[in-house]
């Protein structure tokens, strides 16, 4: 019966580790199969980042810089009046918190009301910004808009 301690890999299933740099007689002595000189013969070979181009000025430096990031930019989450008309009851006061409760924005987001869609109900809408068409539609429906900071 075969015991665990008797088990061995099948002949040819394993390979001896190549021991390089162990003398001329081994066939892998002196330069250890790496050839003479150059980057590929040195230790640390092939550890260059993918953007390294061998000392040539890399692409990211050859291409000109464009534009800038405005550090004071204010980003708004857009909400259309048509969506407000569908989701809310007539006469409600709409604030960013109310919009967040319906999943239209996050509570911390700045909200901009846009004028896409029809507005048939009367609302008091408080938001951080309004488009011109949204203001007109809110007033036309008999509602009010108010900018909050």
Curated annotation (Swiss-Prot):
InterPro entries in the cross-refs: Ribosomal_uL15, Ribosomal_uL15/eL18, Ribosomal_uL15/eL18_sf, Ribosomal_uL15_bac-type, Ribosomal_uL15_CS
UniProt protein name: Large ribosomal subunit protein uL15
Region of interest (Disordered), residue spans: 1-64
NCBIfam families: rplO_bact
Family to which this protein belongs: Belongs to the universal ribosomal protein uL15 family.
Gene (UniProt): rplO
UniProt entry keywords in alphabetical sequence: Ribonucleoprotein, Ribosomal protein, RNA-binding, rRNA-binding
Subunit structure of this chain's protein: Part of the 50S ribosomal subunit.
A GO term for molecular function: structural constituent of ribosome
Keyword Transport assigned: no
Species in which this protein is naturally found: Aquifex aeolicus (strain VF5)
UniProt-listed GO biological process terms: translation
Listed Basic residues bias regions: 31-40
RNA-binding in keyword set: yes
GO CC, alphabetical: cytosolic large ribosomal subunit
Summary of the function given for this chain in its UniProt record: Binds to the 23S rRNA.
């Amino acid at each position: 019966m075969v015991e665990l301690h008797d088990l061995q890999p099948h002949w040819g299933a394993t390979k001896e580790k190549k021991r390089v740099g162990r003398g001329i007689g081994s066939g892998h002595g002196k330069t250890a199969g790496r050839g003479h000189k150059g980057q590929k013969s040195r230790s640390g070979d092939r550890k260059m980042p993918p953007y390294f181009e061998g000392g040539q000025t890399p692409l990211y430096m050859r291409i000109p810089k464009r534009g800038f990031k405005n550090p004071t930019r204010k980003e708004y989450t857009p909400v259309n009046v048509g969506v407000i008309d569908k989701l809310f009851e007539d006469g409600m006061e709409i604030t960013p918190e109310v919009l967040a409760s319906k999943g239209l924005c996050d509570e911390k987001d700045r909200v901009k009301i846009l004028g896409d869609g029809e507005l048939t109900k009367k609302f008091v809408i408080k938001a951080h910004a309004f488009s011109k068409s949204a203001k007109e539609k809110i007033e036309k429906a008999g509602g009010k808009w108010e900018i909050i900071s």
